[in-house]
Amino acid sequence: MSGFSTEERAAPFSLEYRVFLKNEKGQYISPFHDIPIYADKDVFHMVVEVPRWSNAKMEIATKDPLNPIKQDVKKGKLRYVANLFPYKGYIWNYGAIPQTWEDPGHNDKHTGCCGDNDPIDVCEIGSKVCARGEIIGVKVLGILAMIDEGETDWKVIAINVDDPDAANYNDINDVKRLKPGYLEATVDWFRRYKVPDGKPENEFAFNAEFKDKDFAIDIIKSTHDHWKALVTKKTNGKGISCMNTTLSESPFKCDPDAARAIVDALPPPCESACTVPTDVDKWFHHQKN
C-alpha cells in the first residue's frame, strides 16, 4: 500500500538483520501496532514477512522495540523452513495482520487451546510474489485452525486486493473452485513442515476443515480486541514490546526521536547479503501419515 516504506539494517540472513517500517513522513513505526488493521472497508492490511517460494523464516519481532522483521533463531542458528516435497519454501506470501494478537492467556472456545502470543498469520494466495516488509491490502476468504505444540495458531486465507483475479474470490469455496488442490496443499504443508527438524506433525481443529469468510473475520476481530487490551496495558503482555508512535490511548507511545534512536543504535544497512547455507535447497521426502 502507498505510504509505507522499509529500511534494512545489517546484512540479510545474518543474526543482526532487521527490517524497519516507516510511514509516509519517513518516521519509524511498528508494523505490529502502528499500521491500522483495516486498509479500507472490508479490506485488511497485511505485513508480508516471507515472500512466496522463499525459505528464510522471517517474522515480526514482537519482543523488540518497534517490532522490526527479523529472521527467527533456534538454538543460536537462523531458521529456514525445509523444502518438503513437492513444495519449495513457503507456498504463499506469508505474513500477519497488524493490530491483532493471539492472547496466550485466552483459551479459544473453538480449539480448546490458548493463543500463540503473535499477530494472526495470513497466507496470501495471489499471483504476485511480494517483497519482505511490503504492506498490502487483502480480502479475507477463510481460515484454518492449526494447533502448534498445544497453542492456537490461526491461518487466515486471503488474496491481495490488487491481484488481477481478486474480484473472482469472495469466500473459501472460490479458492476450492478456482485453485484446485491449493487448500489441500496448505493443510499438508502446515501439517508436515516441522518434521524435517525432528518435530511431530502439527494438528488442526475442525478436522482440518477451512472455515468461511464470516467465521474468519469474527476471529480476526476477536484478536484485534485482544490486541487493544495489550497496547492499553489492560492485559499482561507476556514480554511483548508495545512501543508505538501513533496510539494516543496507549501508555507505550513514544515520540519519533525516540523511535529513531532505537534504529540508529543498530548496524547500518549492508549492500550484500550473507551466504545462505547450501542445505537450504535440499528436498525432503517424508511419508504422509
UniProtKB/Swiss-Prot annotation:
Record PANTHER family: INORGANIC PYROPHOSPHATASE
Family listed: Belongs to the PPase family.
Modification sites for N-acetylserine: S2
Name recorded for this polypeptide: Inorganic pyrophosphatase
Pfam families per UniProt: Pyrophosphatase (PF00719)
Organism of derivation: Homo sapiens (Human)
Tissue distribution of the protein: Expressed ubiquitously.
Annotated signal peptide: none
UniProt modified residues of type Phosphoserine: S250
Gene name in the database record: PPA1
Subunit and interaction comment: Homodimer.
